[in-house]
């Protein structure tokens, strides 16, 4: 660990911040000093139940994992003689929890990438164009409303829900926070109107009422650790039993993970493109609101979403590809199962001669593994797949630029950017406009920690075209190789 352990807050006590990132693969907590230096981290695997029906998670298990890693890093804070001043929670969008009046979960969490959803009903009753222009979300199985309607139809009791909490908002409750709906996460639900950032009436009528809580911006206070009642069903994780170093910390929702990460790496500004390549690859632009409704309709029709940003007064234009997941599956088919193996495969792919072969196929806008081409080496297969995925990303960027203008610079982030073949392909396509910000370890958690400092009144909210204070000076240590 490097750097000082924190900085003195208003009371003269050494203070630090926690960023919690509830990801598709891992639940991660980062302890960060007020200067941006990483002090420690903890993680647990995100436990999904996968079967022939799809991918789901137990809401209470997810909450317990989030509390566990937060408690673990707060124990480190105590050993360092540091008090936790703020906790910011970010994570996956779309997935969430339907609850009753006492926040008891009524259905499992359906994974954001699970194909189950009742989007046919939305199209039948509201119309595709109306939904996409009204919410900024493409009409498919991904928006939360599609999964909510499917659960209401198939899961007994789900139709009694009075609230829907996105996963980060759910874990905030477990820490003793207040019920809130953060704007960037609410924008992923299909329940929020894009024009006015209020519950969208057609969606509310379709699901039986507004399922959103009080709407807030990422970085606004949403209670204090240990102050609220927590969640029924988690007696071993009562907020009142939180460690003294954590009790009373200001809580906030850090927003949708891709957007929170873009803030941490300095890409949440006009004219910048974030290409964040993790399990999903996110191509993200931050643009001043409002966006012309006709442009919203055209973008959504191409699978590009538009929603409210973690930056005040801005929209996020986002296109997602399951690129990292595709490479993970391909690596397993090639007999490569660890990070070193993937790195070596990437190095070999950089040296391989281009074959022009296509080893992936696209169906309905999604990329799938195609039949591996006989006669190619593993390195040639890897190189061909990486090039195909980079081409898909390039086409999506072209669609976005046609509506919001050409980007001036590019920030590359995410674990897969540390694979030599992926980074080489991106640098080839972006040229000199690309900067790799791999120095930020766990950018989503770092961004959430920063926003908790904003909520606690210890750090300034970044200016609209500025960089977070941490991005201008100290950086956390480097992430491990993907």
Outline where the language-model segments fall.
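N-terminal glycine/serine-rich phosphate-binding loop of ATP-dependent small-molecule kinases
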Residues: 1-108, 133, 160-161, 209, ...
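Active-site core segments that coordinate phosphate-bearing ligands/cofactors
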Residues: 18-19, 125-136, 149-166, 172-178, ...
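Short, basic and Ser/Thr-rich N-terminal targeting/leader segments
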Residues: 23-26, 83, 90-93, 144, ...
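Gly-rich Lys/Arg/Thr-decorated short loops/hinges at beta-loop-alpha junctions or inter-strand turns
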Residues: 46-53, 130-131, 181-187, 376-379
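Short beta-strand-loop/turn "lid" adjacent to the catalytic site in phosphate-handling enzymes
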Residues: 78-112, 138-142, 168, 172-193, ...
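Short alpha-helix plus adjacent loop in nuclease-associated cores
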Residues: 110-129
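Conserved catalytic cysteine-centered active-site region
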Residues: 223-242
